[in-house]
């Protein structure tokens, strides 16, 4: 089967305007492929107001400053150089991930609505508390369900199996899907806690779909 990757670009100019003054001196610029064509334009706007702008590149990204799916390495790679990040795009999926990974302030500018915001630290704190609670549940549980996907780029079966040697006092059940069906997980009522080895956002965004705690492999 032939695969074609077709980029959907937005051609609308991005003008940050007076919001530039709300940003600290050293800024890491990140965006999605939709606005990658406007990155240089935004960089010039920031530099005109005395800001120092940094780009990074993710493992799976095609361009500098690009975030792609769960990959926010373009931000992580420059986190020690910057005071905060500016995300150009819509939605909170990527900026929330950047905030969690880097512990830095993340400002957002939506070119479609011209709205400028800052990630609320309370939201991040709430997520971190949930993660700590899931870790406590994992450590105190004996029957563990390990969610594994067969999707390219997300499959971590080898790392999942390593849990058996690290936690010999627990029983692990490996549940393999392509697309995870949360209803099917309810067929294993004896499982006390789930470990997610697929997209890390599942444990954050989809935890409400489960009656049991779920923790990402990277958080153990």
PLM ranges: what are they?
Residues 1-5, 51, 103-105, 172, ...:
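Active-site regions of enzymes building and remodeling cell-envelope glycoconjugates
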Residues 112-116, 121, 200-220:
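Peripheral docking tails and interdomain loops at the edges
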Residues 175-179, 193-196:
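A conserved acidic, glycine/proline-rich C-terminal tail/linker
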Residues 90-93, 151-152, 199-202, 220:
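Short glycine-rich anion-binding loops that position phosphate/pyrophosphate groups of nucleotides
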Residues 80-91, 185-200:
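Short, well-ordered secondary-structure micro-motifs within conserved domains or adaptor modules
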Residues 1-130, 177:
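The feature marks the mature, well-folded catalytic cores of soluble enzymes
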Residues 94-172, 182-188:
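Redox- and metal-dependent alpha/beta enzyme cores, enriched for Fe-S-associated oxidoreductases
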Residues 4, 26-33, 54, 143-151, ...:
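Short glycine-rich or small-residue beta-strand-to-loop segments that form or flank ligand, phosphate
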